[in-house]
């Protein structure tokens, strides 16, 4: 995709709670000129209904072609967004979903590639770091053109939690969650800042904020998905808007720095997996990772998170079906 392209096309694979919320976010924000929605055959009519429903919002936003799509419609798409997968149930971790969702991912990616698609993959199905890796393996695409939503939502949750604790606008909070999008993620406290002021320095004027409260704050961020799932069954609004933000950065060639699931080539001593860290993203995918200098404790947490993901991938790739389908 070139930065000057006027007609930008997105194909969404998966019209569940996350997918339909993402489609609504795209319409609301006027992102892309064409949106196709792919669903499994037995849910095709739902995609037709959602496309029709969304089209009725267009007079309030901006023109867009919206329709229930088939895999052949991916051929000239700029971006394919994968939200399809088995949902995370109460009591399940994201990593519990590996077996079910790898098989689904393989089927999706194979059909997208067979269409002649030559754009960028954006993966949001969980466990997202593992499924971003499998999308790369099954597609044979360059690593720069396979992106996972990574810790984009986690970092937003972190910023919002800090903003509420410190009574400032979340847009003035600059802080990242890195590592797995899941239980082994960690907060990069050493580089958190409020409008350029290091968090530790900022807290000197916040006498009522104790260190124990910050530990509790991070735990709330890390466990937010479980809290929401237990209360309403699924998380979808936050991740939908995160995906819309990533989509805009790609389609508008923003070269924005966002926390994404990015291929590792030695940064932080990690290799050959996708894991959450900030990266510059634009029209051609990942421009380059942004390697925040971690302190020793954070570095250890990054390595531990990567080791956990690597163990899951190694176990999954013992399956001959996945080995045979791998192109990278």
From Swiss-Prot:
Coiled coil: none annotated. SUPFAM superfamilies: LDH C-terminal domain-like (SSF56327), NAD(P)-binding Rossmann-fold domains (SSF51735). GO terms for molecular function: L-lactate dehydrogenase activity. It catalyses: (S)-lactate + NAD(+) = pyruvate + NADH + H(+). Gene3D superfamilies: Lactate dehydrogenase/glycoside hydrolase, family 4, C-terminal, NAD(P)-binding Rossmann-like Domain. Keywords: Allosteric enzyme, Cytoplasm, NAD, Oxidoreductase, Phosphoprotein. GO terms for biological process: glycolytic process; lactate metabolic process. The active site is at residue 181. It is found in: Cytoplasm. Beta-D-fructose 1,6-bisphosphate binds at residues 159, 174. It is an enzyme of class 1 (oxidoreductase). The modification Phosphotyrosine is found at residue 226. Substrate binds at residues 88, 94, 126-129, 154-157, 235. NAD(+) binds at residues 18, 39, 46, 71, 85-86, 107, 124-126, 149. Pathway: Fermentation; pyruvate fermentation to lactate; (S)-lactate from pyruvate: step 1/1. Allosterically activated by fructose 1,6-bisphosphate (FBP). InterPro entries: L-lactate/malate_DH, L-lactate_DH, L-lactate_DH_AS, Lactate/malate_DH_C, Lactate/malate_DH_N, Lactate_DH/Glyco_Ohase_4_C, NAD(P)-bd_dom_sf. Its EC number is 1.1.1.27. GO terms for cellular component: cytoplasm. NCBIfam families: L-LDH-NAD (TIGR01771), PRK00066.1 (NF000824). Catalyzes the conversion of lactate to pyruvate. Homotetramer. This is L-lactate dehydrogenase. It comes from Streptococcus thermophilus (strain ATCC BAA-250 / LMG 18311). The lineage of its organism: Bacteria, Bacillati, Bacillota, Bacilli, Lactobacillales. The gene is ldh.
């Amino acid at each position: 995709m070139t930065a000057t392209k006027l007609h930008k096309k997105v194909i969404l694979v998966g019209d569940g709670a996350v997918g339909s919320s993402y489609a609504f976010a795209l319409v609301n924000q006027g992102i892309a000129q064409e949106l196709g929605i792919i669903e499994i055959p037995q849910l095709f009519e739902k995609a037709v209904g959602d496309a029709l429903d969304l089209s009725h919002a267009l007079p309030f936003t901006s023109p867009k072609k919206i329709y229930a799509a088939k895999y052949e419609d991916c051929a000239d798409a700029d971006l394919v967004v994968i939200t399809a997968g088995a949902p995370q149930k109460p009591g399940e971790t994201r990593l519990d979903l590996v077996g079910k969702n790898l098989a689904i991912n393989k089927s999706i990616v194979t059909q997208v590639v067979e269409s002649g698609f030559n754009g960028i993959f954006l993966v949001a199905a969980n466990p997202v770091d593992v499924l971003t890796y499998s999308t790369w393996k099954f597609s044979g695409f360059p690593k720069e053109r396979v992106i996972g939503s990574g810790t984009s939502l986690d970092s937003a949750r972190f910023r919002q939690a800090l903003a509420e604790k410190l009574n400032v606008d979340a847009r003035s909070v600059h802080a990242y969650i890195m590592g797995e999008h899941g239980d082994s993620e960690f907060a990069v406290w050493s580089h958190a800042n409020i409008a350029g002021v290091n968090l530790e320095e900022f807290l000197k004027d916040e006498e009522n904020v104790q260190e124990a409260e910050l530990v509790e704050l991070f735990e709330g961020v890390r466990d937010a998905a479980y809290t929401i799932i237990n209360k309403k069954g699924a998380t979808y609004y936050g991740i939908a808007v995160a995906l819309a933000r990533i989509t805009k950065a790609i389609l508008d060639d923003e070269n924005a720095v966002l926390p994404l699931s990015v291929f590792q080539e030695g940064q932080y001593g990690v290799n050959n997996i996708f894991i959450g860290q900030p990266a510059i993203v634009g029209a051609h995918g990942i421009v380059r990772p942004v390697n925040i200098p971690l302190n020793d404790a954070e570095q250890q947490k990054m390595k531990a998170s990567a080791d956990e993901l690597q163990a899951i991938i190694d176990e999954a790739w013992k399956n001959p079906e996945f080995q045979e389908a791998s192109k990278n």
